[in-house]
Amino acid sequence: MSFAPEPSFSHGKPPAASCATAILLCNLGTPDAPTAPALRRYLAEFLSDPRVVEIPRPIWWLILHGIILRLRPKKSATKYASIWTPEGSPLKVWTQKQALMLRGYLGARGHTVEVRYAMRYGNPSIASQLNQLKADGATRILILPAYPQYSGTTTASVFDAVYSWAARVRRIPEFRFVNNYHDDPGYISALAERVRTHWRHYGQAGQLVMSFHGVPERTLKLGDPYHCECHKTARLLAEKLGLGKDRYKVTFQSRFGKAKWLEPYTEPTLIRMAQAGIERVDVVCPGFTGDCLETLEEIAMEARHAFLKAGGKEFHYIECLNDSPTWIAALAEFSARQLAGWPTQAPRDTEALRKSGERALAMGAPR
């Protein structure tokens, strides 16, 4: 097995990066454009991940390439086109802004840390960003998934991508991995502020629906903690908002395929609520830290249409955390705790570096 070539190294010189400690904020991914060809590439990568679809590979390959990649890209492209912005995909836009703001907030706290973002599927890839961080001199990297709740289908897949990259590298940086932050007080407070802000502007509905991304039910039975962590997030958020159990519902969206997923499903729940005479509903998606296709199109458009068609009168979608200062401050505080013990504040000792370089050259180092 051959390993990737190492970046050039000179004794006694600091790395190109401002600090050897870095954070890689990892999100799910997005196509490069709202077109069928771009969606075909994206879906092929996404749906080929065994963490996402746990079906024997030969059988799934036939289904994926024989049916799904022939039919789904065009339909998905239309959905993406409905939410695409001049800046590009909302998910990518928000993730990029969060990374930039996180670096700034950490800097304001005295932490000199490089922060980049990457996508598990699509661009910029996790491997490409790790390559760049390594080339810039990062020797300690915190892997920070944009998923508050752990799932083997998302968080573990990010870790897989990091492990895969490391398997091809000779000199591996030191890594730390964040599993979850579903019950982090700062995250819960940021969610509560988002909801309260919406209520101040538009009033408060009698029911708050908390919609999380769904996963196959069998993953729960096989030991995935995602379902439990979603419910804990919902409970803590409800408590922060002062809502009793009869004032909120937890639902799961984005079901794919015919297998049973975590229930209750979001859209059927909203339809039943409208049919039961509930005229207004507020919907928030706590598991998504940035607005994306699943929130802007599936909830704010499709679910809204279903609720109103079933007899509802008012549907309010509460936007994700996005670039909320309260959220970024909470993320910075959480990240700082995860970085504890790593040097992020000490100034670089240039004199020590110079002497180290002189010793290395005296012992025969080429540079």
UniProtKB/Swiss-Prot annotation:
Subcellular localization, as worded in the UniProt entry: Cytoplasm
GO biological process entries: heme biosynthetic process
Protein name, entry field: Ferrochelatase
Species, as recorded: Polaromonas sp. (strain JS666 / ATCC BAA-500)
One cellular-component annotation, GO: cytoplasm
Gene: hemH
Pathway: Porphyrin-containing compound metabolism; protoheme biosynthesis; protoheme from protoporphyrin-IX: step 1/1
Higher taxonomy: Bacteria, Pseudomonadati, Pseudomonadota, Betaproteobacteria, Burkholderiales
Enzyme class: lyase
HAMAP family for the chain: Ferrochelatase
Function of the molecule: Catalyzes the ferrous insertion into protoporphyrin IX.
EC code(s) of this entry: 4.98.1.1
UniProt: Fe cation binding residues: H213, E294
A GO term, aspect molecular function: ferrochelatase activity
Family of this protein: Belongs to the ferrochelatase family.
Keywords from the UniProt entry: Cytoplasm, Heme biosynthesis, Iron, Lyase, Metal-binding, Porphyrin biosynthesis
Catalytic activity from the UniProt record: heme b + 2 H(+) = protoporphyrin IX + Fe(2+)
